[in-house]
Amino acid sequence: MSAKVWVLGDAVVDLLPESDGRLLPCPGGAPANVAVGIARLGGTSGFIGRVGDDPFGALMQRTLLTEGVDITYLKQDEWHRTSTVLVDLNDQGERSFTFMVRPSADLFLETTDLPCWRHGEWLHLCSIALSAEPSRTSAFTAMTAIRHAGGFVSFDPNIREDLWQDEHLLRLCLRQALQLADVVKLSEEEWRLISGKTQNDRDICALAKEYEIAMLLVTKGAEGVVVCYRGQVHHFAGMSVNCVDSTGAGDAFVAGLLTGLSSTGLSTDEREMRRIIDLAQRCGALAVTAKGAMTALPCRQELESEK
């Protein structure tokens, strides 16, 4: 039986442009996407965060509940609005984001909103939760507490630089998060920002060793992913698909990764690690073939039919 994966952060309504100029509201937000992705793959997930006492907040609560995510620790905030993001897609399906609500309800997460952690559980989060107080303190408290309880931390920076007014603070928060994380997924851009170096096997291993990261992954889009695990670097080629919308690819990848790791733990051998990365890659590849982030997340049946 797989361990529970708690996901902390923002539950967002993405506004996607339609061909007729209208905006289509879609449930999203990287943490919420990961929680739903895990549930669709047959894992056990719970969401920790805040939404506004507004129609978009109600939409996110209904969506997560319908998808089988535990929302016991998703709180309604009557004073702040649900995070809302305008997503713009270019001709290649690549996206840019405009945050319409600042500060949004998710950034007011308190330490009293956190659950009691259990041995073997996982916590996953992104850097948006670190971008403002009191969410920053709550996120670091959660990371520290779950490790003390014998659990594991997964961190995907998913950096949105326009949410950070102070680059020095961003770097400090990233370093602290890396020190607390067991598993870290970086994009190529995030790798360059954090390491300041070109990407090669030696530098990837050095960063993993510096922060004592058990599994460090650098995703390269269509080119695949590089994984440093137990001091060894492994290269996985990308999967060829027709990209319609890349919005949820990274979140689908993480959902597949954590679904696998929550079943095996971090003591898995190389063969099992390769199986988990294959699952994560197939999830990411399927997610780009449909429009939307959460709507495109694959379920277990889709993956089985692709074999």
Swiss-Prot record:
Q: What class of enzyme is it?
A: transferase
Keyword check for Ribosomal protein: no
Name the Enzyme Commission number(s) assigned to this protein: 2.7.1.4
Pfam families according to UniProt: PfkB
Keywords per UniProt? ATP-binding, Carbohydrate metabolism, Kinase, Nucleotide-binding, Transferase
Output the superkingdom of the source species.
Answer: Bacteria
State if Transferase is listed as a keyword.
yes
**What would you give as a GO molecular function for this chain, any one?**
fructokinase activity
Q: Which reaction does it catalyse?
A: D-fructose + ATP = D-fructose 6-phosphate + ADP + H(+)
CDD domains assigned to the protein according to its UniProt record, in alphabetical order: bac_FRK
Gene Ontology BP term (one) = fructose metabolic process
Family (UniProt): Belongs to the carbohydrate kinase PfkB family.
Q: What's the name of the protein?
A: Fructokinase
